[in-house]
């Protein structure tokens, strides 16, 4: 978009609604990729325009006719242009993302929250756990969104948020503090289970890197802005998942449960381990590639994964 185009937008667009409509039109024409919390140009525009004005997403309808200052319009137009030209996810432009109804700070040190596990958390893992968990582990926590959402869902639980990346943990720590959960959620740096004490968790939730080599080579440009450490996991996408399966039973209580997301790599997991009784979970709000295993099932499958123990 050249300067004339920008000047036209700033001079002829006046209200929040004008900016929303213009952003939707620009996004639709640019054929950008959605997948970082939205799946359509309208939601993408809302999540860019309103946070750029320091407004909540659910402003009253009549507020959309509010007029904007020149500096506000320039800020929005600049971000729309960067979203299109540089293919930067909106969450990195606004430093805001939402998960389980909660707002989180994000930047390019962490993945943008989007896991279908959020639906399970909102439902308090109904039908998957036998009792309220007292100790929860969020492995590969990234921004800390899963750990923090679990702390809200289970306010009496202690939650450990583990990641190998100090950059990611810095973001997680910021979010933990912003949500006032420093006494409930503990950030821990560890290479998966390697540096963890042998705590017996009632629930281990993990959204590890799981993108296989083929998919990594073909990712839309938007995903190139995310840390590769949070995406790639070997040729078949299961490098880290195997280690998790090998170590998880030692860290689960007797009635403990592992919930793990592997995305498209579920195909490789089912092909390679047909005898393991993965329970593949279904979602009302879209998403797949998330399985559940109990401690007993993990112990029974140990012959497959013992080689990957730390």
UniProtKB/Swiss-Prot annotation:
Annotated EC: 2.1.1.298
Family annotation (SUPFAM superfamilies): S-adenosyl-L-methionine-dependent methyltransferases
A Gene Ontology molecular function term of the record: protein-glutamine N-methyltransferase activity
Reaction(s) catalysed by this chain's protein: L-glutaminyl-[ribosomal protein uL3] + S-adenosyl-L-methionine = N(5)-methyl-L-glutaminyl-[ribosomal protein uL3] + S-adenosyl-L-homocysteine + H(+)
Any single GO BP term: methylation
GO cellular component, one term: cytosol
Alphabetized Gene3D superfamilies for the sequence: DNA helicase RuvA subunit, C-terminal domain, Vaccinia Virus protein VP39
Keyword annotations of the record: Methyltransferase, S-adenosyl-L-methionine, Transferase
Class of the enzyme per the UniProt entry, highest EC level: transferase
UniProt xrefs under Pfam families: MTS (PF05175)
InterPro entries referenced in this protein's UniProt entry, alphabetically: DNA_methylase_N6_adenine_CS (IPR002052), HemK-like (IPR004556), Ribosome_uL3_MTase (IPR017127), SAM-dependent_MTases_sf (IPR029063), Small_mtfrase_dom (IPR007848)
Family: Belongs to the protein N5-glutamine methyltransferase family. PrmB subfamily.
NCBIfam families associated with the record: hemK_fam (TIGR00536), L3_gln_methyl (TIGR03533)
Function: Specifically methylates large ribosomal subunit protein uL3 on 'Gln-150'.
The protein's name in its UniProt record: Ribosomal protein uL3 glutamine methyltransferase
